[in-house]
Amino acid sequence: ETDGEQEMTRAFVFPGQGSQAVGMGGDLLATFPIARETLEEIDDALGRNLTKLIASGPPEELTLTENAQPALMAISMAVLRVIETEGNIDLSASCTFVAGHSLGEYSALAAARSLGLADTARLLNTRGQAMQKAVPVGEGGMAALLGAEMDVAQEIADEAAQGEVCSPANDNAPGQIVLSGAMSAI
């Protein structure tokens, strides 16, 4: 407490893969120079024009893991820098914590200044490429089961597998379990 008033707790939480969309951050990039500068810094670190892919796609390219991961982090960092610049605040100093869902943990590390922006971009580029190589495009998939408990999710996965890989991959939240495996089983 400060002078009889309760001090506010701040957190910044970053999204995981799957929330990407062509044109994301477009208004932000058109309005705030710091947002454009952030993406230019990431483009330079990667040696490619990720900004153009984010702005105009095509969607099937943006959704590839090797592109989606650095793209989501890029927009997350652009949002963060706009908030810091326009609000004249340093979120890394004024937040109680930062967090992220899955991929968003990397954005949280960059927001906390535990990783530099260029290093985070390169790390996610490499991570995304490795994940993309692990499963050829169109062969693997994921599906969220809503309202299922783990034992029911396991039964559904076992029945769906029919000789293919299909299993619970992530206990996302109470009532949401993600199955992953061969697309034919999903």
Per-region residue spans from a language model:
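Short, glycine/charge-rich beta-strand/loop segments that flank catalytic centers
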Residues: P59-E60, T96-A99, L103, G128, ...
